[in-house]
């Protein structure tokens, strides 16, 4: 009986160590405290969309865990778009600017044709290129198929990044982790 008890104890300790190892390996590579913008702190992403010709600006906010707001765009028009990130009522976009060498935005328009130019100034241009906090959208065709959308992804610490178009996305990375992801519907 004594050997059975030791075997059970060995199995229990092994199972506990296995669980601890898996929990630790599922966390980010660095401490959350060391992360300049932990993904758990982002609650809202706002796009300020300025119709360049009409000089009118409207804001569209994606709130984490809620539905996708719809941004009306017109074929043939150009828009200047600014992205802001929020933690509750606190604008944390400056934290992304401060860590511009560690962040990159990908704009994916899978059911539309939109040409994107990054307009970031030196405050949001780092070693990886322009983060994408300020962009110009030249809309060719908003509704290329049903349910057009923009999938916006903020990547933290990519090994490399490219601002070029990659399929339907403007920007691509290798490595890194997703800090935030938002979906905005598009309409004409």
Regions found by a protein language model. Name each.
Residues 2-5, 19-47:
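Bacterial Sec-dependent N-terminal signal peptides
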Residues 8-17:
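Sec-dependent N-terminal signal peptides
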Residues 28, 92-130, 143:
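Extended, polar beta-sheet/loop recognition surfaces of beta-rich domains
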Residues 49-74:
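N-terminal edge beta-strand
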Residues 72-101:
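Short, well-structured hydrophobic secondary-structure segments
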Residues 74-78, 109-112, 140-150, 188:
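A short, structured loop/turn motif at beta-sheet edges
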Residues 80, 85, 140-168:
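Internal, hydrophobic beta-strand segments that form the core of beta-sheet-rich folds
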Residues 165-188:
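Short beta-strand elements
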């Amino acid at each position: 009986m004594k050997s059975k008890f030791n075997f059970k104890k060995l199995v229990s300790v092994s199972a506990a160590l296995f669980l601890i190892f898996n929990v630790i390996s599922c966390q980010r590579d660095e401490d959350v405290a060391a992360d300049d913008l932990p993904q758990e702190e982002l609650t809202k992403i706002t796009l300020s969309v300025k119709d360049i010709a009409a000089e009118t600006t409207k804001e569209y906010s994606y709130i984490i865990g809620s539905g996708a707001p719809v941004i009306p765009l017109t074929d043939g028009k150009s828009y200047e778009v600014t992205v802001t990130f929020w933690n509750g009522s606190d604008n944390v976009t400056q934290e992304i600017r401060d860590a511009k060498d560690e962040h990159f935005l990908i704009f994916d328009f899978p059911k539309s044709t939109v040409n994107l130019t990054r307009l970031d100034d030196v405050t949001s241009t780092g070693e990886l290129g322009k983060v994408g906090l300020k962009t110009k959208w030249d809309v060719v065709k908003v509704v290329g198929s049903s349910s057009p959308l923009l999938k916006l992804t903020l990547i933290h610490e990519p090994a490399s990044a490219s601002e070029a178009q990659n399929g339907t996305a403007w920007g691509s990375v290798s490595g890194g982790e997703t800090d935030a992801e938002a979906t905005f519907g598009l309409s004409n």
